[in-house]
Amino acid sequence: MLILKTVKQLQEFVASAGDEIGFVPTMGALHDGHMSLIKKCVSENAVSIVSTFVNPTQFLPGEDLEKYPKKEESDIKICELCGVSAMFIPDAKEMYFDDEPCIIAPKKYSSILEGKSRPGHFDGVLRVLVKLFNLTRAKRVYMGKKDAQQLVIVQNMVKTLFLNLQVVPCEIVRESDGLALSSRNAYLSEEDKCNALRLSRALINASNLIKGGELDTSEIKTGMLKTLEPLTVDYVAIVDRDFNQISKVELGNTIILVAANVGKTRLIDNIWV
């Protein structure tokens, strides 16, 4: 496996890699959720690239940019074990110079939920991803459903800009107790981890209500909020797969999302129904 630190090194690798390139963009601190993306990428492409870059432009002032988990040595070992062809591990100076953002997330997506709570976040995500997509020339890009709003926004960008790649959505990976895997779980104390399970339990309860015939979104959200007590809830939302608010669950076309603070850590989770 090659370790690439500069844009030039990546460009030289890509130039000789052929057309069957798969790409997994990450911010490092890789866990089993990332591994599921990486393994799928490796199995479906002749050449696989994983980036680990903590992108500063998607963090708001006061967020956890400086303390975001960094585990480069562990990340490299994981990628080697998965059979990755090359890792791209740039620093911020390599990715950004005096350029201004030229890609802006549509207000339809960026003004609600995560976008409302973290204004400018999705602009920063698209800013780095369009660079990485162009650099890797990937045919397929693998992204997790856990960041559902991000996934839909990226799919929209790919469609709008006529980018010649396929965004491959990958299922959420959970601990045995139901907690969705996240690099930010490293911030949680044992007590926090117990409280964090309220997110997945709220989603499971919502799923059970739907299976029982309840399709009214206000009733489902009321039940979820009770399960989430006493957490500080940012939002509970039920939308269609283009992130339009809906009053009735549309089976096969609905995402149920939750964001809440657990201790000092903000967590998100969702299910697709």
Swiss-Prot record:
Main location: cytoplasm
Residues binding (R)-pantoate, per UniProt: Q58, Q150
Known EC number: 6.3.2.1
Subcellular locations according to the entry: Cytoplasm
Reactions it catalyzes: (R)-pantoate + beta-alanine + ATP = (R)-pantothenate + AMP + diphosphate + H(+)
Binding site residues for ATP: 27-34, 144-147, 173, 181-184
Pfam families attached to this UniProt entry: Pantoate_ligase
UniProt binding sites for beta-alanine: Q58
Protein's UniProt keywords contain Nucleotide-binding: yes
Keywords of the record: ATP-binding, Cytoplasm, Ligase, Nucleotide-binding, Pantothenate biosynthesis
Active site: H34 (proton donor)
GO BP, sorted A to Z: pantothenate biosynthetic process
Subunit structure: Homodimer.
Protein task: Catalyzes the condensation of pantoate with beta-alanine in an ATP-dependent reaction via a pantoyl-adenylate intermediate.
Note: The reaction proceeds by a bi uni uni bi ping pong mechanism.
Name recorded for this polypeptide: Pantothenate synthetase
Organism: Campylobacter curvus (strain 525.92)
